[in-house]
């Protein structure tokens, strides 16, 4: 009994509910003005029905949002006539009835300010066709009168919608930028965390025969061809010795006087006025460490009382205490000085003698 009674109650409520086109605020011959929040007269907006035997629909065919649900006029029902253009039809043969619309029970009493009633429009129906079928009312010329003055409410939708579109676009661009930043960070960060000074002959654990040292060693004026291939073949072996020097400070070289003297003999000399171009001297090494050419010129002016290489190492250690021997090995490899790399590897060798 309980579910059946609830279902019956719901059906009764649906039957008593007003149709969707009926206004919840105004009487039958009025319509709700959503802009002014009041009830306006259908007659004051559309004028009298333009064709004989037509009357106003309920609420002029407008809903409470100001949208047209049906045309404002409809043909009188059977036995009803309206020859004088009244608001509603009346029984044929009787006098025209002028209704006095009033708000229903519970409806708002607010009414809009009265306006002049427009003149009666021209009836588009021909004398030979005094009426049109009800199925054609929506597309008939008479029904088009209802659309002469649409409500301006829908025109305000786009300006209110524009800030939301701009906000969505900005949020989308921000999310894309964040995702790109995260992607680049994940791609580049592991490379930065890897050893910033890779050793010659080793690229990802595989011997590399295309290091800059090969091109420099085979260039004119560097070394003889036989010595070039001999020293280039030593690079993979030297890399194992240099790998132990990766974390050792560069200042250690100042204490290893024997190794330092050998490097001075190899790197400090420059060719005379008639010599060829020098490759991989102390002057080039200073440029790798970011020192200006004026500093190199001043350091070379102190020869022979002071070695430019020793002055360079002291300058780098003072300016960057974290400088390592591995960084020096990388610069020597980029300059193509395999002979200097062989001398530097003595600091990492344990009882190994190089011929």
Swiss-Prot record:
Induction: Up-regulated by the pro-inflammatory cytokine TNFA and in skin upon tissue inflammation. Residues 23-163 are extracellular. The chain crosses the membrane at residues 164-184. The keyword ATP-binding does not apply. It is found in: Cell membrane. Its main location: membrane. Residues 132-144 have a biased composition (Low complexity). GO terms for cellular component: nucleoplasm; plasma membrane. Residues 185-355 are cytoplasmic. Residues 1-22 form the signal peptide. It comes from the Eukaryota. Residues 120-147 are annotated as: Disordered. It is a single-pass type I membrane protein. Keywords: Cell membrane, Membrane, Receptor, Signal, Transmembrane, Transmembrane helix. Probable cell membrane receptor for the IGF-like family proteins. Binds IGFL1 and IGFL3 with a higher affinity. May also bind IGFL2. This is IGF-like family receptor 1.
């Amino acid at each position: 009994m309980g579910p059946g009674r609830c279902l019956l109650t719901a059906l009764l409520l649906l039957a008593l509910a007003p149709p969707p086109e009926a206004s919840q605020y105004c009487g039958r011959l009025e319509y709700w003005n959503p802009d002014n929040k009041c009830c306006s007269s259908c007659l004051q907006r559309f004028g009298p029905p333009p064709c004989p035997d037509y009357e106003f629909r309920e609420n002029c065919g407008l809903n409470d949002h100001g949208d047209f649900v049906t045309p404002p006029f409809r043909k009188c029902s059977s036995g009803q006539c309206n020859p004088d253009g009244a608001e509603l039809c009346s029984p044929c043969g009787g006098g025209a009835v002028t209704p006095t619309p009033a708000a229903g029970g519970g409806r708002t009493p607010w009414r809009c300010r009265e306006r002049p009633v427009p003149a009666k429009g021209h009836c588009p129906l021909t004398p030979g066709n005094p009426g049109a079928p009800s199925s054609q009312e929506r597309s008939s010329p008479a029904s088009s009168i209802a659309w002469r003055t649409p409500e301006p409410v829908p025109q305000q939708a786009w300006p209110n919608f524009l800030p939301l579109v701009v906000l969505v676009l900005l949020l989308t661009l921000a999310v894309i930028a964040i995702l790109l930043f995260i992607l680049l960070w994940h791609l580049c960060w592991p490379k930065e965390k890897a050893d910033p000074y890779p050793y010659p002959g080793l690229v990802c654990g595989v011997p590399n025969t295309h290091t800059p040292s090969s091109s420099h060693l085979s260039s004119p004026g560097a070394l003889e061809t036989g010595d070039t291939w001999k020293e280039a073949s030593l690079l993979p072996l030297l890399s194992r010795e240099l790998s132990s020097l990766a974390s050792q400070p560069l200042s250690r070289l100042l204490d290893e006087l024997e190794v330092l003297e050998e490097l001075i003999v190899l790197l400090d000399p420059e060719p005379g006025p008639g010599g060829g171009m020098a490759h991989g001297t102390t002057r080039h090494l200073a440029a790798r460490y970011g020192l200006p050419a004026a500093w190199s010129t001043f350091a070379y002016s102190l020869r022979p009382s002071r070695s430019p290489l020793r002055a360079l190492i002291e300058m780098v250690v003072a300016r960057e205490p974290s400088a390592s021997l591995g960084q020096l090995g990388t610069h020597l490899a980029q300059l193509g000085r395999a002979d200097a790399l062989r001398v530097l590897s003595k600091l990492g060798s344990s009882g190994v003698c190089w011929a």
